Amino acid sequence: MTLPVNPVDNLAALIRCPSVTPAEGGALTALEKMLKLMGFSANRPVFSDDNTPDIENLYARKSGNGPHLMFAGHTDVVPPGDEKDWKHPPFAAAIEDGVMYGRGAVDMKGGIACFVAAVARHIEKHGNIKGSISFLITGDEEGPAVNGTVKLLEWAKQRGESWDASIVGEPTNPNALGDMIKIGRRGSLSGTITVHGVQGHAAYPHLAENPVRGIVTLVDSLLCPAFDEGTANFQASNLEVTTIDVGNKATNVIPNKATASFNIRFNDTWTAESLQAEIISRLERAARDNRLRQGRETPIKYELTWRERPSHVFLTHDEKLIGTLTASVEAVTGKRPELSTSGGTSDARFIKDYCPVVEFGLTGQTMHMVDERVALADLEGLTQIYERFIADFFG
């Protein structure tokens, strides 16, 4: 029996599966075959929810006496766009000049391929694992993230599963393998503001109420002053206006409605609830103190809608998990990785409620891009890091 010790072969098998969210595309089946070669038991639960597609997931475990390590990730990928723009077909796993091309190469089929290879090498050398390893893999990370990791964790917990630590194999390195380990993430909160006015002719503004004035005023109240100056482990909270829309193509008509959407990435100065309260306070004050039209007595009329579920800020403090991974990275790459909380959200935001979690994978320079690709040398390097981590974590 040949174990899946080669990360290049593993990744090629996964890339050739067109698993664009929500399609499974054969990726979980390919992964399950690799894991069963190593004696893992596997389940493929499918989760559903209103107004979202059904999603297939995978939970596989190889049990032993000792701590339980979870590797988490996703096999779904974003659409490749126009395939004519690619140097090589996005699902062909073509190799040229020591580089493999394909959608998901770094985000994050590459990380999965390397961890599979690392486990296989450990088993090949040592015969067993002094503990348990599980793979918690979803097909719903790039999509709504409703029927994926969040439900798979609860599903596993209800069946008696618990974990001592987790690694998420997202591409964490900005420039080169070994740059960065993610030990936490900022929270994320999104909302939409709608201001109602009175439509009218642009030449007769006294007969109308321009909601654009109101939306600009309210948005400005959220942009200034700054929410905070950052903390010891997190950069300053940051709000970005992502859309402003009036739905008006005519240049001589004052619209009757204006909307603006925003997203704020926040640090541990705030909880989602305290930040929502701060935003509401700023908007109410700005609406009360300003008008849509000079001489108008009533305040700005607006509605605030929170979009999606907020992601909560978190920071991992587990010394064994962080220290062992840091030492493994340094031993293989010769670099001491930065411990960071930068970047966007990931499924680690769900895992943190079940066990300590960190993130470490490939470099992310080409993720989601045309010609997404990974150096074969990086696949081997990441596999060696994971293999060393497994050996040291289980002692």
From Swiss-Prot:
Q: Which residues bind Zn(2+) 1?
A: H74, D107, E170
From the UniProt record, give the pathway where this protein acts.
Answer: Amino-acid biosynthesis; L-lysine biosynthesis via DAP pathway; LL-2,6-diaminopimelate from (S)-tetrahydrodipicolinate (succinylase route): step 3/3
CDD domains named in the record:
M20_DapE_proteobac
* Keywords from the UniProt entry: Amino-acid biosynthesis, Cobalt, Diaminopimelate biosynthesis, Hydrolase, Lysine biosynthesis, Metal-binding, Zinc
Free-text remark on how the cofactor is bound: Binds 2 Zn(2+) or Co(2+) ions per subunit.
Subunit info here reads: Homodimer.
Tell me, in a sentence or two, what this protein's role is.
Catalyzes the hydrolysis of N-succinyl-L,L-diaminopimelic acid (SDAP), forming succinate and LL-2,6-diaminopimelate (DAP), an intermediate involved in the bacterial biosynthesis of lysine and meso-diaminopimelic acid, an essential component of bacterial cell walls.
Output the NCBIfam families linked to this UniProt entry.
dapE_proteo, PRK13009.1
Record protein name field: Succinyl-diaminopimelate desuccinylase
- Organism, scientific name: Brucella melitensis biotype 1 (strain ATCC 23456 / CCUG 17765 / NCTC 10094 / 16M)
